[in-house]
Amino acid sequence: MKHNSLKFLFIAASISIGLSSCDGYLDQMPSNALPSDESINNIEDVGSALNGVYSGLLSSEYYGADFISRAEVGGEDVQTSTPSKRTENFYKFMYRQNNAPTGLWKIPYQVINRVNVLLQAIESGKITASPQLDNAKGEALAVRALCNFNLNIVYGYPYQKDKGASLGAPIVEKVLTANDMPARNTVAEGYEAIEKDLTTALGLVSDKVNDGHFNKWAVLGLQARVYLYKGNYDAAFNCAETIIKESPYKLIQNADYLAAWSNEYTSESVSYTHLTLPTIA
């Protein structure tokens, strides 16, 4: 009997040790990844992270297709061919539990999280201050404003319906954990956050042309659009007029219009994204 008791005690102790070892083993970070707070340590890392921010905009569930086609086929500009797996639900407005387009919510928040990881690293003080770093921070803030703007367009009533009193999308300005469940903010709160990010970005970004990236003129262009949706027409006009009068961008002349389509960027390309992103300037 004593022998059996010792045997059971030994087995129980072995299980306990095994479970403790297992816990430690399962807590290990993957060998092919870094924690977000350790992955951005210098200006080169900042450039790579910023390119990752922009690449998220190009998802087929965002600017790569769905965000554009949703508006086009939802109005009267474009009629979808049937059957069309990508645009038919938008065109017919046939949203069910098993086919509702979740990407228009998921992808912008993925991009926002990338922005917040980058901003957390920049604001930690561990990266040497420089104009490059300021510019990268400004670009990241502008992208976050763009994503928040789009989320409120899709998931909130137009601002002018009730001065933004109705619910829109949650404002996320920090790196989230798996347990975080931010509540929806009002549309007015969303616009306030958008305008704050754009105002800060405007004081940080360069005024030089860097195709595929936000600069001063692209931020002003987004500000103009935000003010237009908000009904602040004087402010929208002022932003647009500044771009027209002071920026290096010019309208293409009639004689050059057809040839311009053979180029990825033109003198009119104030705010564009592209598939192969250059490093930050």
Please state what every model-predicted region is:
Residues 85-155, 185, 203-207:
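Conserved, well-structured interaction surfaces
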Residues 1-20:
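Sec-dependent bacterial lipoprotein signal peptides
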Residues 273-279:
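Conserved small/polar residues in nucleotide/adenosyl-binding loops
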Residues 154-188, 192:
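Short coil/linker segments at helix-helix boundaries
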Residues 22-69:
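Membrane-proximal, proline-rich intrinsically disordered regions
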